[in-house]
Design a protein with these regions (language model features):
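Conserved alpha/beta catalytic core and glycan-binding cleft of carbohydrate-active enzymes
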Residues: 68, 81-84, 89-212
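Substrate-binding/active-site clefts of carbohydrate-active enzymes
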Residues: 1-68, 73-99, 119, 164
Length: 212
């Protein structure tokens, strides 16, 4: 629920752009013909508009009550915390989740970042949420590569990352520890290369993360 398939303002009209562009999408304040993009996909949904919030909540409830889905992963999740420009964990989206008798009872997993300013929000999501722990991922990668001064950080990540979650009263289960995912290096590439080698796929090395 962070973007639709239109891409940016030069893409085709495939979804809500043709219904009510200004209601469903975040537009640049002083240039409404352009999308404000914090997702890296060309557009971002307008998370303070009632129609957008209703769309999200209605569809989530449908998946739980009719399809018996027991949890959701939000990729990325930080755009849902941007009713305006800044990330706000008290935004309407999180309030609706917290108060909903159905959705508040299922698993909620956040990829806690986006490409906007201040978008890296690991450790800052509300109590109902678990988070992909990007600090665990980066620390384990550094440790495997023999980077200096990572042993203490490595121990902290293995024992629950209390520096990230304890301040909000959350327990170690709030952290989803991972090393690789569908974004960036595969596990084999991770232990084989320091830099990405994507030239052969036609993107000339511009796609994917460079970090290892």
């Amino acid at each position: 629920y962070n973007h639709t398939a239109e891409g940016n303002e030069f893409g085709p009209t495939l979804c809500f752009r043709g219904i009510d562009n200004a209601a469903y999408y975040r537009l640049v304040d002083d240039a409404k013909e352009h999308y404000y993009d914090t997702t890296g996909t060309g557009n971002s949904l307008l998370m303070r508009h009632p129609h957008v919030l209703q769309l999200i909540m209605d569809s989530l409830r449908y998946w739980v009550t009719e399809m018996h889905v027991d949890g959701f992963r939000f990729d990325p999740a930080a755009p849902r915390a941007r009713p305006f420009h800044e990330v706000d964990k008290l935004s309407a989206f999180f309030d609706l989740i917290q108060q909903d008798p159905v959705i508040s009872q299922v698993k909620l997993i956040a990829e806690p970042w986006d490409v906007g300013d201040g978008g890296y929000q690991v450790g800052n999501f509300p109590p109902l949420w678990t988070e992909w722990n990007g600090k665990y991922r980066d620390t384990v990668r550094d440790f495997w590569r023999g980077e200096p001064r990572t042993l203490g950080e490595f121990a902290s990540r293995l024992t629950g990352s209390s520096d990230l979650y304890e301040h909000s009263g959350r327990k170690p289960i709030a952290s989803i520890n991972f090393v690789t995912a569908h974004d960036g290096f595969t596990l084999r590439d991770l232990v084989s290369y320091n830099d990405k080698r994507n030239e052969a796929n036609g993107e000339d090395g511009h796609d994917g993360e460079s970090h290892n």
